[in-house]
Every structure is written in structure tokens, then in C-alpha cells.
Amino acid sequence: MIKVDNIPETSDVKPEVSRPYLNIKPIESMSDQEAADFISKEFEDAHEVAEFDTYDKLLSEVFNRSEDEISIDFSLSDKIKEILEEFHFDKWETMSEAERVDSIKELAKAVGDALELDAIPAIDIVDGDDSYGFYDPKNNTITLNSNYFSDPIELVNTLTHEMRHAYQHMRAEVLETWEDALYKVNFDNYISPMPLPGGGWLFFVDYFDQYVEVDARAFANKFTETMV
């Protein structure tokens, strides 16, 4: 590793005193090309060490997180607020299934536009079991369980939560900010809960408290807190 600290500042230092660089000095029998390759490798090794240090720092910020640590710079537009009116219970219970699906897709598009997503996820409605919904990054689709459509607040919570996951995956590919890197590292080390035979989940707390899940919940709260 290249050392750059503790270098004397005087201009008349004898060569043998500049010891910090002696550990990367190529042997005298090396050719010019071998010496160049040697120095290049030293720089590469130093860069890898720096990358490992950064990765460890990111990893330390991924797990054991809570929503009160997350600050999301996002405000609901008038358009989004207007669409959310469709999900208030008195209105929602009078709507047909087709009208509900239209409102879901309209909200997804409005949120996706606000998040500046490259592509709005397709909405897939299924008659599922115990899952509210999920986002599939490979196909850019959000699957929603129609069995929970009777609760419009929970539906909005699920939809916006999964829309945030779509945003996270997009930003993890861009990698322009520290938060983008957090998304990337978390997805690379994502913890999924495992169902237990007798009911319940294994690793649920680890799943629940990882950064991308905490961030998605905090984002969804911005919508549901206006509906209660």
C-alpha cells in the first residue's frame, strides 16, 4: 500500500530519508516495463483497499435501521392528493373493480412521474394468499393482491412502498449519491424472510430493519398519513 503520510516538508531532504516510499520501490533488475507494471499494481492495490473500506462503511449503514432515521425529500403534489381522494373509504366502496384498477394505475403513474422513474412499473392484479404485493425489478412490474383491496389505505401503502422499491432499483444502477450506493449494497446483501412450518417468519426483523425496506416504509407513510 502506498503511504503518503509523515513526509518531511524540507526541500533538502536526502533520498535515503524519504522512507515512506521505500516499500514500493521496484528492484534494480526490473526493466522499465516491469517497473511501470509494479507501480501500477501498487496503485491498484491501494484503490482496492479504499474500495473495501467504503463498502464496509456502506454495509454498516444498511442494517438495523429505523424509520425515524430516514428523511425523504418528497412532497405530495396537488395531482397526487387529488388522486388519493379516490382511495378514501366512502368513495372507494362505491367504485367498481374496473374503476379501482384505473385509480391504482393513475396513482402509480403520478408517483412514478414524481420520482422521475425511467419507466412506470406495470400493475398486475392477482388473487393471492398472504402477501400484500411485491415489486419485480426484472420485469418492472408491481403485483398487488386483490384480497386486500377492501382496505384502501393499506392498498395505497403497498403500492407506494413498491413504487419506492422501483425507484431504489433505478438509483442503484445510477450510483450518483451515497444513498444510491446504500441501495446497491443493500440489494447485493438483501435479506428475505423465510416462512416457518408452524407459522411466522425466520429473519423477519433483519428483513424489516434493512435500509431499503425502512426507506420504502417511510416513503409510503407520506401518503397514508394524509388519509387518516
Sequence positions of predicted segments:
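Residue-level detector of alpha-helical secondary structure
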Residues: 14, 28, 36-47, 56-63, ...
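Short alpha-helix carrying the canonical HExxH Zn2+-binding catalytic motif
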Residues: 151-167
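Metalloprotease/metallohydrolase-associated module, dominated by Zn2+-dependent proteases
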Residues: 119, 177-228
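Catalytic Zn2+-binding segment of zinc metalloproteases
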Residues: 163-179
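Non-Sec secretion/translocation targeting segments of pathogen effectors
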Residues: 1-17, 41
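Zn2+-dependent metallopeptidase catalytic core
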Residues: 97-119
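A short, surface-exposed helix-loop junction/capping segment
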Residues: 71-98
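Catalytic zinc-binding patch centered on the HExxH motif and its immediate surroundings
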Residues: 114-143, 148-153
